Amino acid sequence: MSDFKATVSETMSASGHSGFHVTGYEKIEYGFTLIDRIFHPSNTNLADCYKKWGRCLAVTDQNIYNVYGKQMEAYFQHHGLGLKIHKTKIGEKVKTMPTLLSIVDSMNEFGLYRKEPVLVIGGGLVTDVAGFACAAYKRNTNFIRIPTTVIGLIDASVSIKVAVNYGNYKNRLGAYHAPMHTFLDFTFLRTLSTAQIRNGFAELIKISTCSHLDTFNLLDKYCEQLIEQSFGRANGSSQELIDAADKINREGIHEMLRLETPNLHEIGLDRVIAYGHTWSPLHELVPETPLRHGHAISIDMAYSATLANNRKLISDEEHRRLLNLFSRAGLSMDHHQFDEDVLSKATTAILKTRDGLLRAAVPNPIGSCTFLNDVSAEEMNVALRRHKELMKEYPRNGEGIEAYVDASDTGYTENSQAEEERMVGATAKKAGSLNGTSGKIQSANGTGAVKNTNSMNDHHTNKNKTHANGVLRKGSVTEKEVNGNGHAHFVEPAKA
């Protein structure tokens, strides 16, 4: 939430023309509560936020609803609160204006009061799009966040940035809009797939490599256990792992807040947490099937580490330690389409975003950071060629495990129609009914054809996923059937 205070004074220009000058200051307040089992009836924290209104409009992913919907409904019923749930299907390819407008439709139909908060439950994609819908609706609608993924809990929950994609540009349309409150419930990780745990692990490497050596050391020590045991939330996790995971999560969030809150609106462009985000925004979307965000930034971070090592900013030992951590985690360090052409295009794009300077964050040494602005194209290419040679020494030539998006990231397909196509079609139909046109679907290039980019896992919802070793990962109570969003139903194992 925010309040704005301003003063107005009369002015006189050098040319003798009168005018006015406004000086304003915006006070932004938002809080975090670390709490387990947020939807347990004994936890009143969430219900207390909605007692004033007697009701709640919630926005969540369809598959989050499949796993937790009954708990949500029982929780609000227990506390005597009405609940309407907008179930959406947000993936990277449908992180778009049509998806946002579908949320706005529900907000309008619900009849939100001016300061009534929307409840947003899901991963970073859900909180990004629904948060932007709240920023746009009546220009400033309150919302409360409950993130459900590692990226959502560690990274997206800290920022006040909300956005949708535009064409091939990530987060090109957006706003700065702080939530009223964020509830951090790490028990959601019990039902998160290994692929999505790994995806979020990259964000913790990002924070710790350039800012927090103690956290980096813990990630290095417990890497495989953290990923396999859902950050200590899976059944059978040792107390040692639970304590380490809780410390990592708390310190990671605290460090992100420490780094981000003085620069919430990104007026300062030298950002420590931009490590891994110099070249990744482009090559994340270069493959026909896009890379997961965590894998894309890992390629960027690993390459940046090689660049830093070439400059002797990190030692050979530190360089190898960092590359080995990515490899142990199953995160990508390279991609066959990451070449000099992609590097050049990505550099050109980021220079525009960063006001003409590269501002590449690199470790110097691990646990601290410096920014590079004087890197020539030749130096970048030399580092890339060396990086490619180094990758030959690692499993899969440095490519990651489950690195590509699936139905949990790109959207969903129902009845042979991609969710992105359905959303665009629904929006076009609505627009047509308002202006008397037929509402013909138009693609981004105006051809009228909408490409189904969800090529990997059509009808992926409710299909079991396997880990890299082909064995279904053990859950906290029983084995898990993984949904399209990376979360899972609990299913009883077959009896002998």
Please provide the spans of the model-predicted regions:
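A glycine/threonine-rich phosphate-anchoring loop and its flanking beta-alpha core
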Residues: 132-228
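Residue-level signal for inorganic ion chemistry
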Residues: 35, 58, 147, 185, ...
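Acidic-aromatic/histidine active-site loop/patch
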Residues: 124
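Short active-site segment of divalent metal-dependent hydrolases/proteases
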Residues: 127, 131, 280
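C-terminal charged capping/lid subdomain of soluble metabolic enzymes
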Residues: 2-10, 15-21, 25-26, 202-205, ...
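ATP/NTP phosphate-donor binding region
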Residues: 2-117, 493-496
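Active-site segments that bind and position negatively charged phosphate/pyrophosphate groups
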Residues: 222, 227-341
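Solvent-exposed alpha-helices and their adjacent loops that cap or buttress functional pockets
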Residues: 50-51, 111-113, 136-138, 165-166, ...
